[in-house]
Amino acid sequence: MRIALGIEYDGSKFYGWQRQAEVNSVQAELERALSIVANEPIEVQCAGRTDAGVHATGQVVHFDTNAVRKEGAWTLGVNVHLPDDIAVRWAMPVNDDFHARFSATARRYRYVIFNHNFRPGILRKGVSHYHGDIDVERMHDAAQALIGERDFTSFRAIGCQSNTPFRNVHKVSVSRHGMYIVVDIQANAFLHHMVRNIVGSLLEIGLGNQPLDWMATLLEAKDRSQAAATAKPHGLYLVDVTYPESFGLPKLSLGPLFMPD
């Protein structure tokens, strides 16, 4: 039997999603809890591997099991065995042709900036603090150059292992909510550090350090060294993964917190 789960987590205390020897990971904690409930070893596949310090409100995983359990066992039961900063939001059986990663048609991230002269005391691990006068409209306008299928070499990590630098960005917006700025971006998939590298460069435009057309210039350059420094991990959230409607997966509010969908 194949089961799909929707999970959320605060990535502050984890060395990323992926299971690694001798460090704490979201995958290892989830597999440990699932294995207890299933009474057999469980391995999970996820929609998107998040880095150290990065959060998720809409991560999707699947696993195969011989165990027959009520739906509540895969939600309430698993949550009992998870640390407080990981939670299962929903669970449902799926066909064997469903794959959390390969069946996905889009991923959506939100990057939350706390724009204030002083650092935050609350949510300090859930937002990234940047001071200065940030022009959100400039950031939004500049970001539109990213839409479409593009070569994102300038925005991929040096150690990125993807076979191709091309990704298709479906939509991107930058908006202000009081002291908070939200960069919201959806694409078919993302390169390693792609969102944080994009945000780092957009911030340079918002601060007036680079011209409005700089994002287009960076796309043409195809050179990571020409773009800005990688933005901090704390403000980044995987908020949604899109699948064909035929799979019938639940759609919940994106978040984080009270942010509208």
From Swiss-Prot:
InterPro entries: PsdUridine_synth_cat_dom_sf, PsdUridine_synth_TruA, PsdUridine_synth_TruA_a/b_dom, PsdUridine_synth_TruA_C, TruA/RsuA/RluB/E/F_N. GO terms for molecular function: RNA binding; tRNA pseudouridine(38-40) synthase activity. PANTHER family: PSEUDOURIDYLATE SYNTHASE (PTHR11142), TRNA PSEUDOURIDINE SYNTHASE-LIKE 1 (PTHR11142:SF0). Homodimer. It is an enzyme of class 5 (isomerase). The gene is truA. This is tRNA pseudouridine synthase A. Substrate binds at residue 109.
